[in-house]
A protein has these predicted regions:
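Conserved GNAT acetyl-CoA-binding A-motif
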Residues: 113-125
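Active-site rim helix/loop that mediates acceptor-substrate recognition in acyltransferases
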Residues: 23-51, 59
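Conserved beta-strand-loop-alpha-helix junction that forms the acyl-donor binding cleft
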Residues: 97, 123-133, 151
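Conserved acetyl-CoA-binding loop-helix of GNAT-fold acetyltransferases
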Residues: 92, 98-111, 134, 138
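A short beta-loop-alpha structural element at the N-terminal edge
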Residues: 1-16
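A short, internal acetyl-CoA/4′-phosphopantetheine-binding micro-motif in the GNAT/acyltransferase core
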Residues: 76-77, 88-97, 125-126
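Conserved acyl-donor/pantetheine-binding loop and adjacent beta-alpha core of acyl/acetyltransferases
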Residues: 57-89
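Conserved active-site alpha-helix within GNAT-family acetyltransferase domains
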Residues: 115, 127-145
Length: 166
């Protein structure tokens, strides 16, 4: 098993795994997926390969002062909005689910976020997505707000404060 990190703007194969995951899941409400590939402006994609096959990927994005910054939803001031990192999306190949890859990728991304000086980690999860919710809670995220996001999809906004090196 190999984990690599690449710049989000250069990674189309991860998007293909996201598309495959979306097409396979039963409850489409669990997964906010944009069918048009638009790479995030700033961030990284973490990927796990098994024998050269992409089996899991995770998007970490830095929203800065973009209107999509989840910090706006919880009332963070502008200075703190600049310290928000989005633990954005995860996709795991169906034949590899249940092996802890979401947790592994989130931990790796968190290590990098701390080194880069970010202080607030945020993500959204459908409240009924038990597996993703358990993973986030296990990593210390708190459900700070539940509201409609992404064109009317209900989401729990998850928040975690970390100590940064900067």
């Amino acid at each position: 098993m190999e984990i690599i990190r690449v710049d989000n703007t250069k990674d189309r194969d991860a998007w293909l795994l996201f598309e495959k995951t979306y097409n396979e899941i039963e409850n489409k409400e669990f997964f906010a997926f944009d069918k048009e590939y638009t790479p995030p402006k700033d961030g990284f994609t973490y990927k796990i390969y098994d024998n050269n096959k992409l089996i899991a990927c995770f998007l970490l994005t830095f929203p800065h002062l973009d209107e999509e910054n989840l910090g706006y939803d919880i009332g963070l001031c502008e200075k703190d909005l600049l310290k928000v990192a989005h633990m954005d999306s995860v996709a795991v190949d169906s034949s590899y689910r249940g092996r802890g890859y979401q947790n592994i990728l989130m931990k790796k991304a968190e290590e990098d976020v701390v080194k880069l000086g970010y202080k607030y980690l945020m993500c959204t999860i459908h409240p009924d997505n038990i597996y993703s919710m358990k993973n986030a809670l296990k990593l210390g995220y708190k459900n700070v707000l539940t509201k409609e996001k992404y064109g009317g999809k209900i989401r729990a906004i998850m928040f975690k404060e970390v100590a940064s090196f900067n």
